[in-house]
C-alpha cells in the first residue's frame, strides 16, 4: 500500500518550512512553493520553474496540491455566485463570491453543517457532521479564485476580502481555522491584509480569547438580541456564554487587536416583531455602551420552513435611528444573492447530520401533527 501523500494546502508557512527541512532542503524553498500555489494558482510541480527538477520530483513523490472540487454553482442577478463545494462522502459545503466595484469578497465555510443551533439560520437546521480541514478551508478560496481566474503573469488575485461567515462556527474549529487564516494573511499565501479577513462568531468565549492570543483579524460578533432571555432562544450558545461574558471576551480581543481599529462589528439580524422594536433598540444601545462597535443590521433572509419573517423597512429604519441617537455607527446590510439562497443565514449545503437534528425536528413535527389532528 502506497504512503498517503501530504496535501500542501494543509500546511501554513511554518509547517511547510519544517517539511522542507525534513526533506533536506533549504526552508526558503517553501516560500517559493507557496507563491506558486497561492499567487499563481499552480498545482502541478512541473510548472514551478524556479524550483530545480530534482526537488520537483521529490515533491511529486511525497506531496500533492488538492483543493476540494466545485460540484455546481448558481449566479444571482446581482452577480453573486454561490458554489457547492464537494468535501467527500457525498457532502457539500457552500461558499459565496460577492463582487463589488472596489472589492470581491468570498464568504467561506469552516464546518460541514454547524454545531450550534441558532433558530434563524438555515445551516443550523441541517445539523452537524465534522470540522473542515485546513485544505478544505483555504481550498475554497483557491478553487473559487481558479474559477474566477488568477492573473497568471502578475499573481494578482480575484478575491480581495475573506469573511469566515459561511457554514459553521469558526471558533469551534480553531485547530484548522488558525493555520488557514495564517495562509490567507501570509505574504507568500493569499497575501490579504488583516483588515480584509473577518471572522464571525456567535460567542464561544474561551476560543475567542485563544484566537486573540495568536492571531489578529477583523472580528464580527453575532449578537441578534438585546438581552439574555431572547438570545437564549435565538442563539442557544448564549446559555453557556451569556451576553456579559461574551462582551467581556469581545473587549479583551479588541484590546489585543490592530485589525479592528479599536472597534468590533456587531451583527444583528432583523426578525419581524421578534427583536426589532424601538424598545429593543434602546436596550441594545445600552448593552453595547462599553463595547466600541459599529452595528450591522441584517434584514432576515427567509428559508423554507423558517419560523421568522423579515422586518419591514420602516421597522429597520426606526431601529437604526434609535441606535444612531446613542452615537452608534449603523449600517443596514444590502442583501446579496437572496434569489439563489446565498444570502446571510441561507447557506445549507448537503450534510450527513451526526447530531440527528433534522430527524428530531421531523419527529417533533409529526407528533405535533398527530396532536392537532
Swiss-Prot record:
Pfam families assigned to the protein according to its UniProt record, in alphabetical order: Radical_SAM, RlmN_N
Entry keyword annotation includes Disulfide bond: yes
Active site: 94 (proton acceptor), 344 (s-methylcysteine intermediate)
GO-annotated cellular components: cytoplasm
Principal place of residence: cytoplasm
Cysteines paired by S-S bonds: 107-344
Domain spans labelled Radical SAM core: 100-339
Cofactor note text: Binds 1 [4Fe-4S] cluster. The cluster is coordinated with 3 cysteines and an exchangeable S-adenosyl-L-methionine.
Subcellular location, record wording: Cytoplasm
UniProt keyword list: 4Fe-4S, Cytoplasm, Disulfide bond, Iron, Iron-sulfur, Metal-binding, Methyltransferase, rRNA processing, S-adenosyl-L-methionine, Transferase, tRNA processing
Binding, S-adenosyl-L-methionine: 168-169, 200, 222-224, 301
Function: Specifically methylates position 2 of adenine 2503 in 23S rRNA and position 2 of adenine 37 in tRNAs. m2A2503 modification seems to play a crucial role in the proofreading step occurring at the peptidyl transferase center and thus would serve to optimize ribosomal fidelity.
Name used for this protein in its record: Dual-specificity RNA methyltransferase RlmN
Species assigned in the record: Shewanella pealeana (strain ATCC 700345 / ANG-SQ1)
The encoding gene: rlmN
Amino acid at each position: 500500500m502506497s504512503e498517503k501523500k501530504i496535501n500542501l494546502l494543509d500546511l501554513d508557512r511554518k509547517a511547510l518550512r519544517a517539511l522542507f527541512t525534513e526533506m533536506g532542503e533549504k526552508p526558503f524553498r517553501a516560500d517559493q512553493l507557496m507563491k506558486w500555489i497561492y499567487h499563481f494558482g499552480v498545482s502541478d510541480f512541473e510548472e514551478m520553474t524556479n524550483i530545480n527538477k530534482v526537488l520537483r520530483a521529490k515533491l511529486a513523490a511525497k506531496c500533492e496540491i488538492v483543493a476540494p472540487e466545485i460540484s455546481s454553482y448558481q449566479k444571482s442577478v446581482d452577480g453573486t455566485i454561490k458554489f457547492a463545494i464537494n468535501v467527500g462522502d457525498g457532502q457539500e459545503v457552500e461558499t459565496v463570491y460577492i463582487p463589488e466595484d472596489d472589492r470581491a469578497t468570498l464568504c467561506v465555510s469552516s464546518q460541514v453543517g454547524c454545531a450550534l443551533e441558532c433558530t434563524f439560520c438555515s445551516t443550523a437546521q441541517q445539523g452537524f457532521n465534522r470540522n473542515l480541514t485546513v485544505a478544505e478551508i483555504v481550498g475554497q478560496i483557491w478553487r473559487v479564485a481558479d474559477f474566477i481566474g488568477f492573473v497568471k503573469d502578475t499573481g494578482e488575485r480575484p478575491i480581495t476580502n475573506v469573511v469566515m461567515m459561511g457554514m459553521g462556527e469558526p471558533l469551534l474549529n480553531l485547530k484548522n481555522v488558525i493555520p488557514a487564516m495564517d495562509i490567507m494573511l501570509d505574504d507568500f499565501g493569499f497575501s490579504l491584509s488583516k483588515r480584509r479577513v473577518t471572522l464571525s462568531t456567535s460567542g464561544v468565549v474561551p476560543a475567542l480569547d485563544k484566537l486573540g492570543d495568536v492571531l489578529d483579524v477583523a472580528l464580527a460578533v453575532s449578537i441578534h438580541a438585546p438581552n439574555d432571555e431572547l438570545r437564549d432562544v435565538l442563539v442557544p450558545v448564549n446559555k453557556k456564554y451569556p451576553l456579559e461574558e461574551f462582551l467581556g471576551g469581545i473587549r479583551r480581543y479588541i484590546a489585543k487587536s490592530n485589525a479592528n481599529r479599536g472597534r468590533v462589528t456587531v451583527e444583528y439580524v432583523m426578525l419581524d416583531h421578534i427583536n426589532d422594536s424601538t424598545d429593543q433598540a434602546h436596550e441594545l444601545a445600552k448593552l453595547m455602551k462599553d463595547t466600541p462597535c459599529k452595528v450591522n443590521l441584517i434584514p432576515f433572509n427567509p428559508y423554507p420552513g423558517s419560523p421568522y419573517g423579515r422586518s419591514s423597512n420602516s421597522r429597520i429604519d426606526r431601529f437604526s435611528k434609535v441606535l444612531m441617537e446613542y452615537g452608534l455607527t449603523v449600517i443596514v446590510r444590502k442583501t446579496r444573492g437572496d434569489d439563489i439562497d446565498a444570502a446571510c443565514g441561507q447557506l445549507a449545503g448537503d450534510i450527513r447530520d451526526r447530531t440527528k437534528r433534522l430527524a428530531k425536528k421531523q419527529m417533533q413535527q409529526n407528533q405535533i401533527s398527530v396532536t392537532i389532528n
